[in-house]
Curated annotation (Swiss-Prot):
This protein binds specifically to 23S rRNA; its binding is stimulated by other ribosomal proteins, e.g. L4, L17, and L20. It is important during the early stages of 50S assembly. It makes multiple contacts with different domains of the 23S rRNA in the assembled 50S subunit and ribosome. Part of the 50S ribosomal subunit. GO terms for cellular component: cytosolic large ribosomal subunit. It comes from Methylocella silvestris (strain DSM 15510 / CIP 108128 / LMG 27833 / NCIMB 13906 / BL2). Belongs to the universal ribosomal protein uL22 family. Keywords: Ribonucleoprotein, Ribosomal protein, RNA-binding, rRNA-binding. This is Large ribosomal subunit protein uL22.
Length: 128
């Protein structure tokens, strides 16, 4: 009995890519989303390439997918793209049990995340 989802309509100068069910916790993935938010796509790709975080590969793949969507589906100029939004949502949490001493059990939680990246084409001011 949750509210109806209202999808955010993309503007003409925007493109989006979504990665669902990434096997990493939302808190860890959000660190990388904060890293690329508001940056030009070339800079964001460079930062992700040299990041030592495990999720950097998944974020980079999603960003490259958003760039391809912008270029092929929306006919946007790749050099003018900026990461307008990069946000993380919680997905399901798989619960497992690990046997412990004296017949007890410990709870293991394996969280999943959704990653959404929205790119926006920003007009470059004319050089005089």
């Amino acid at each position: 009995m949750s509210k109806e989802k209202t999808p955010r309509a993309l503007k003409d100068n925007e493109a989006k890519a979504v990665a669902r069910m990434l096997r990493i916790s939302p808190q860890k993935l959000n660190l990388l989303a904060q890293l690329i938010r508001g940056k030009k796509v070339e800079r964001a790709l460079a930062e992700l390439e040299f990041s030592r975080k495990r999720a950097a590969f998944d974020v980079r793949k999603t960003l490259e997918s958003a760039i391809a969507n912008a270029e092929n589906n929306h006919s946007l100029e790749v050099d003018d793209l900026v990461v307008a939004e990069a946000f993380v949502g919680k997905a399901l949490v798989m619960k497992r049990f690990s046997p412990r001493a004296r017949g007890r059990s410990g709870k293991i939680q394996k969280p999943f995340s959704h990653l959404t990246i929205v790119l926006r084409e920003v007009a470059v001011a004319a050089q005089a």
